[in-house]
Amino acid sequence: MSKVATRFAPSPTGALHIGGVRTALFNWLYSKNKNGTFHLRIEDTDKERSKDEHKIQIIKSLKWIGIDHDGDEYIQSTKINDHVNVANELLKNGHAYKCYCSSAEIEEQKKRARQKKLPYVYNRKCRDLQETNAPTIIKPVIRFKIKIEGTSVLKDLVQGDVEIENTTIEDFIILRNDGTPTYNLSATVDDHQMKMTHIIRGDDHKINTFKQMQIYLAMSWDLPNFAHIPLIHTIEGKKLSKRDNASTLDDYSKIGIMPDALRNYLLRLGWSYQDKEIFTLKESIELFNLEGIGKSPSKLDMSRILSLNEHYIKTINENELYDHLVKYCEIYKEKIKPEKETKIKPSLIFLKNKAKTLEDIFNNAKYIIFDDVKFEDKDLELIDDKAKSIIKEFKEKLISINTLNKETLEPIVNDLIKKYETNFKGVGQPLRIALTGSKFGPGLYDIIISLGNEEVERRLGNKIII
């Protein structure tokens, strides 16, 4: 039995779609589970839309979520000659033919199909056309000659056996009239040359699979195993598209979703193992199988993603969380100065308790990350004469404290509450605004302890405040 080999084959025409990430993950996990190999093929034959920057971003995105590939990337555009050679061989052996139908004729056929509310299938007009009767002024396309008798059976490892009438499969184009190969030819030749044993992809590819199976048979190549996974839908039950919000991997990393959390979510999106919800990477590899993939579409639930992300934020240690925060800020916010580590890292113990994303942590930690406090007019309006007196007196009392903790700070706050006949908010709010620039955020004592005596005194002496 051949060693398992799977692949992920994105087109570098834009950011990596979340559905593609799940497909890559399932292929990667299956190959790892079987001690096989996982390959990345860049399908860049659309020269107008394919960009190097998209290819680079796809590779970075896969790496971000923990998916690595074996060997170098397989670049489809470098194999076009091989694709063309196979097309010519199919033509020579009678498994393909030249089609001279004009674009106007094809459009008319499509129009009639739409009027009858039927799927378009080429009418095979040129299938048996003799070369001597072919028009000389039209450059032909080459179509594959489908074996139209009988049925084709796809032995799908997820969907089970799927059977269709061969007459419903059109004689599809394999070479355009400019000599360039089409998707179904290129993908089939590549999969054969790469020795792929398992093709795991979305179930919107099923009709392509029936076409590609006929190429395999015509070329006397061994068929790989096929597994078609259900598509991802929106929470409303519609097919997820690139136009939907949060449809690309970048959309999730940008708001501070952690790689492990998103990988865990995508693993469970359409796959299950007993009633287990949280999987380590090691468990994912050991337990993943194709039998656990369901047949129905799965709904993308942002609230569930946030809940999982919150779980990961709260359960990983502060050293790991700090590393994630540093990387996140470097890409999407502002680079954290190395000297801030000693203040931020201990503060993560309380900062992560109110956070669902890395962005939440960043927003709550701004007062530590940045030395200069930025105030909004609406918050400064809350600093009246009474608030200024509270800030000034707290600063004076703080000088006598050597160790900052709740036990040393609470008596000072309670004295001020009593003296100014107010409540905790009456004391805490002006202090919080003076120290962080906001009336919201972490607990007052946590803020003071994390900043330290010297920095607290400096900020409470800010002329903008007092």
Swiss-Prot record:
Specify which residues bind ATP according to the UniProt entry for this protein. Answer: K242
Where in the cell does this protein reside?
Answer: Cytoplasm
The gene name reads gltX
Q: Which cofactor is essential here?
A: Zn(2+)
Identification of the protein by name? Glutamate--tRNA ligase
Main enzyme class: ligase
Q: Which GO terms describe its molecular function?
A: ATP binding; glutamate-tRNA ligase activity; tRNA binding; zinc ion binding
Which species expresses this protein natively? Pelagibacter ubique (strain HTCC1062)
Keyword field:
Aminoacyl-tRNA synthetase, ATP-binding, Cytoplasm, Ligase, Metal-binding, Nucleotide-binding, Protein biosynthesis, Zinc
Q: Which reaction does it catalyse?
A: tRNA(Glu) + L-glutamate + ATP = L-glutamyl-tRNA(Glu) + AMP + diphosphate
List the InterPro entries hit by this protein, alphabetically. Answer: aa-tRNA-synth_I_cd-bd, aa-tRNA-synth_I_codon-bd_sub2, aa-tRNA-synth_I_CS, aa_tRNA-synth_I_cd-bd_sf, Glu-tRNA-ligase_bac/mito, Glu/Gln-tRNA-synth, Glu/Gln-tRNA-synth_Ib_cat-dom, GluQ/Sye
